[in-house]
Amino acid sequence: MRLRNLILLTCTISIVLYSNQIVAGDSVGLPAPTSTAEGQYPSHEHFSPYAGRNFPTQVFWGDTHLHTGMSFDAGAFGARLGPEDAYRFARGEELTSSTGLQVKLSVPLDFLVVADHSDNMGFFPRLNSGDAKMLANPTGKRWYDMTQAGGQEGVAAAVEIIESFSQGTFPDALASPPGSPAYRSAWDEAIKAAEKYNDPRSFTAFIGYEWTSNTGGNNLHRVVIYRDGESKASVMEPYTTLKPLGSDNPRDLWNWMGTYEEKTGGRLLAIAHNGNLSNGIMFPVVDSFSGDKFDLSYAETRAKWEPLYEATQIKGDGETHPLLSPDDEFADYETWDKGNLDLSAPKKDDMLQYEYARTALQTGLQLGRELGV
């Protein structure tokens, strides 16, 4: 310890002595502090590469893609907590989870987007509570009994419910489409929870939802995030994928977003995710719905509404793939590449370049040159 102190003391003295030399102008050819420096240096234009830059200096941590029991998938597989619980948990409160465990974050988040699926939002809370209209339907009563039984029966009910919705056989009597009292109630609950727990300069509770396009089992999901509060977000209910009120085409989602902004004066953005489960249609060079090549209008519209991309999440990493980045030792991180979202179609190697973020950037640069963006 003494030797260490001696070394530190020696270093400190050396620095002080060297500093005194500079101040005095000794041996380094600098003018003394009392003399003018005019004419001592060659004239030149001053330049700093960092002058004028205004980069953020504070990092905020949060989640832009969280589902609660209001969502069709999370609710199907046992989530019982709602939007208020999600915001409380994000702010650092201790909760009892849907499995009965006490849970708490090690560090509270700075922001959260509760992004429950817009299709059939609020279905599972109604089913789990034994809603009279649900139980009056034979299928609804059977699903209720299966979910209450839990275990393998509950899992079987979840799979059956999701498959029936995906295949278009979901009973109309059990649906919660936009415009229905049940849907309005669910959306109001989501909005009010965000408003209640939003605390400016401390915690930001964003209003949002997930638009869940799953054409042919191919994932084109987007999380839609509002930059607005209740007064604007409540004017229009979320966009869904089922016709005639909705669509599974991203262009139609962007049109809806434009209508919202024109009608309310508000602002929206969308964040796509899991291109790795799209089977080559998340970042294509031709329109997967029409087969047409993209034009300038498409490029500008997508860039406007989708400035961000969710590069990784629980259903696999979306940054790159070992076949696309063979020299990157981390390219095989959490790779999901067996097929599309529901595994109804297998993955082919020629699909990969249109699924991942790195090659999406390359494709974007290519389209930029071709379209003059």
Segments (PLM) and residue ranges:
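Boundary at the C-terminal end of the N-terminal hydrophobic targeting segment
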Residues: 19, 24-25
